[in-house]
């Protein structure tokens, strides 16, 4: 038995013993996705967390995702295998900056991407994902909207909803992975894989999205590649997504826009901090518990409910 097989077996036993479930983000490494009870994007997993009867929820993803699960599930124990697994997007917007924008634009609703710290989310009117951002903004009864922290997603929403003024909060919030994508990389990938369709995440720069055959969230990419007759796809998002796509569509071929050999930017260093050893320890010792203050959790839940009413 290999070490990976041993860990998978031990984690499976721990889940039963502790009445725990593992929620694994689509960007997780292959072995972590295998041991997860549910895989998906951050919103999908937050909803799954609300529906589970498990006593313990282990979130195999970056820290803001565990915060989100805790806010929506105050009576359950939520664990993060590594509390240092941060997010450049989440870190790019602090409460002070958001409050300054709210004071400057008092009548503008605040729409925050789910990749935001829980304390900033507590000041939001709506919390969206890459798959719901356009739909929510379209339905808002406001001409000016504060949108953050992802500037690329804000640009995409602005393009899709030109009749509204999107103010980026902050002006330069970026994902460390998607920020490095260029049109030149797209041209090289298309030349290398001429029969492949390009799928891009809305966190990518607008020039990448305009070159893509499909733009969508990680879950939407899985669905698109499953339903599309094409057999090959170039994937313009974090390289761990290739694992999720191969698990769900084993007969098709998926190529990352950029490989880890070509650029360190292909892999999110924070997502990469979560591995089987840490997952096992987290379940075994029930660390590290993520607990969101009650008043913050209530405000975040209210913003989520506001969003759900529009979808």
UniProtKB/Swiss-Prot annotation:
Coiled coil residues, start to end: none
Name of the gene encoding the protein in the UniProt record: nadA
Binding site for iminosuccinate: 25, 42, 113-115, 130, 201-203, 218
One function term, GO molecular function aspect: 4 iron, 4 sulfur cluster binding
Pfam families per record: NadA (PF02445)
Name this polypeptide is given: Quinolinate synthase
Known EC number: 2.5.1.72
Keyword annotations: 4Fe-4S, Cytoplasm, Iron, Iron-sulfur, Metal-binding, Pyridine nucleotide biosynthesis, Transferase
Protein source organism: Saccharolobus solfataricus (strain ATCC 35092 / DSM 1617 / JCM 11322 / P2) (Sulfolobus solfataricus)
Ligand binding ([4Fe-4S] cluster): 87, 175, 268
Cofactor needs: [4Fe-4S] cluster
Subcellular compartments: Cytoplasm
NCBIfam families from the UniProt entry: nadA, PRK09375.1-2
Pathway(s) annotated for this protein in UniProt: Cofactor biosynthesis; NAD(+) biosynthesis; quinolinate from iminoaspartate: step 1/1
InterPro entries, per database record: NadA, NadA_sf, Quinolinate_synth_type2
Gene3D superfamilies: NadA-like (3.40.50.10800)
Comment on bound cofactor: Binds 1 [4Fe-4S] cluster per subunit.
One GO term of the biological process aspect: 'de novo' NAD biosynthetic process from L-aspartate
């Amino acid at each position: 038995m290999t070490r990976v097989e041993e860990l998978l077996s031990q984690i499976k036993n721990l889940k039963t013993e502790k009445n725990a479930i593992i929620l694994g983000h689509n960007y997780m490494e292959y072995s972590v996705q295998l041991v997860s009870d549910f895989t998906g994007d951050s919103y999908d997993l937050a909803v799954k967390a609300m529906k589970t009867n498990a006593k313990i929820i282990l979130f195999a993803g970056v820290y803001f995702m565990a915060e989100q699960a805790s806010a929506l599930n105050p009576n359950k124990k939520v664990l993060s295998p590594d509390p240092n697994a941060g997010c450049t997007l989440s870190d790019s917007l602090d409460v002070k900056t958001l409050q300054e924008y709210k004071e400057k634009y008092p009548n503008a609703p605040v729409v925050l991407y789910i990749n935001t710290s829980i304390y900033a989310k507590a000041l939001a009117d709506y919390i969206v994902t890459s798959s719901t951002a356009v739909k929510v903004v379209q339905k808002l009864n406001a001409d000016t909207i504060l949108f953050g922290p992802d500037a690329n997603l804000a640009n995409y929403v602005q393009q899709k909803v030109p009749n509204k003024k999107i103010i980026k909060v902050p002006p330069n919030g970026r994902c460390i992975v998607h920020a490095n994508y260029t049109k030149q990389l797209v041209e090289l990938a298309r030349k290398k894989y001429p029969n492949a369709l390009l799928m891009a995440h809305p966190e990518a720069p607008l020039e990448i999205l305009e070159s893509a055959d499909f733009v969508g969230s990680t879950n939407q990419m899985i669905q698109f590649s499953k339903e599309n007759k094409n057999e090959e796809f170039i994937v313009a998002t974090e390289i761990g997504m290739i694992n999720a796509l191969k698990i769900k569509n084993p007969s098709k071929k998926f190529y990352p826009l950029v490989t880890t050999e070509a650029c360190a930017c292909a892999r999110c260093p924070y997502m990469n901090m979560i591995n089987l050893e840490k997952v096992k320890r987290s379940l075994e010792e029930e660390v590290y518990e993520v607990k969101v203050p009650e008043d913050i959790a209530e405000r975040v839940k209210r913003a989520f409910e506001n969003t759900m009413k529009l979808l």
